[in-house]
Amino acid sequence: MGKFCCFTSASEVVGGQSSSRSGKGRSDEGMIKYGFSLVKGKANHPMEDYHVANFINIQDHELGLFAIYDGHMGDSVPAYLQKRLFSNILKEGEFWVDPRRSIAKAYEKTDQAILSNSSDLGRGGSTAVTAILINGRKLWIANVGDSRAVLSHGGAITQMSTDHEPRTERSSIEDRGGFVSNLPGDVPRVNGQLAVSRAFGDKGLKTHLSSEPDIKEATVDSQTDVLLLASDGIWKVMTNEEAMEIARRVKDPQKAAKELTAEALRRESKDDISCVVVRFR
């Protein structure tokens, strides 16, 4: 279990869990580098954003594991995902032959485990955006909620995740017996509570929510330069293009990640802010 868990070593981390932290790393060959930065928002609760950024070797393959988990109503669920989700994906027996199916199954099993342990984990929940890089050549990206993945390739910027919002998934929420509120001055919410339509956890709303991920793949080649994962603390105040401009311009990925979180603060983002920048060349 431990080899799948993706905490960065203390020598690579600056800051503490409660306020802000950043770090960096690279692949064994040193060709692919990553950096991350997390900053606590202005809300009066503990930091609810968690991340993964690590390279591991398993069965003669090098895997890059990157993720952002944005919790709500507590940090227990994103902390659980940080420890367990990638492990559960890689434990699927058919991962190496059918990554898409394995990722989908592991998302479902992990959500069921969270719901079964709600007495310990509470009734909160979390978004997730995960990226698995296989041997530096193939990317598998999955997400639930509004944490986002954006890829820069050949000068083009592509969003590799889907923002799961109540407004766009109203019909499926209503089919499950829920409703979408749309009060003046507020974003649409599931049953007047949750601003995302898919999430891990949220036991009290689960009958109206999905944890099924959207999954996309991409081939990494000489034209692929940057992958950016971030929570909505960035996306509420920056477009994909604005965020990627910083990620591409600042060549050191840790410095790029810190510049992104700093820019979100300058734009008065109130939420927890987190991002992982992966630079391929």
From Swiss-Prot:
Residues binding Mn(2+) 1, per UniProt: 70-71
SMART domains named among the record's database cross-references: PP2C_SIG (SM00331), PP2Cc (SM00332)
Record note on disruption phenotype: Abnormal hypocotyl elongation under continuous red light.
Binding, Mn(2+) 2: 70, 232, 271
Subcellular location: Nucleus
Highest taxon above the source species: Eukaryota
Catalytic activity from the UniProt record: O-phospho-L-seryl-[protein] + H2O = L-seryl-[protein] + phosphate; O-phospho-L-threonyl-[protein] + H2O = L-threonyl-[protein] + phosphate
Cellular component aspect of the GO annotation: nucleus
Keywords of the record: Hydrolase, Magnesium, Manganese, Metal-binding, Nucleus, Protein phosphatase
Cofactor note: Binds 2 magnesium or manganese ions per subunit.
Residues of the PPM-type phosphatase domain: 33-280
InterPro entries: PP2C (IPR015655), PPM-type-like_dom_sf (IPR036457), PPM-type_phosphatase-like_dom (IPR001932)
Pfam families named in the record: PP2C
GO molecular function, one term: protein serine/threonine phosphatase activity
Coiled coil: none
Signal peptide (residue range): none
Cofactor annotation: Mg(2+); Mn(2+)
Primary localization: nucleus
CDD domains from the UniProt entry: PP2Cc
EC number: 3.1.3.16
PANTHER family: PROTEIN PHOSPHATASE
Similarity-based family: Belongs to the PP2C family.
Function, as annotated: Involved in the regulation of phytochrome signaling. May regulate phytochrome-interacting factor 3 (PIF3) through the dephosphorylation of phytochrome.
Subunit organization: Interacts with phytochromes (via N-terminus).
Name of the protein in question: Probable protein phosphatase 2C 9
Organism listed in the record: Arabidopsis thaliana (Mouse-ear cress)
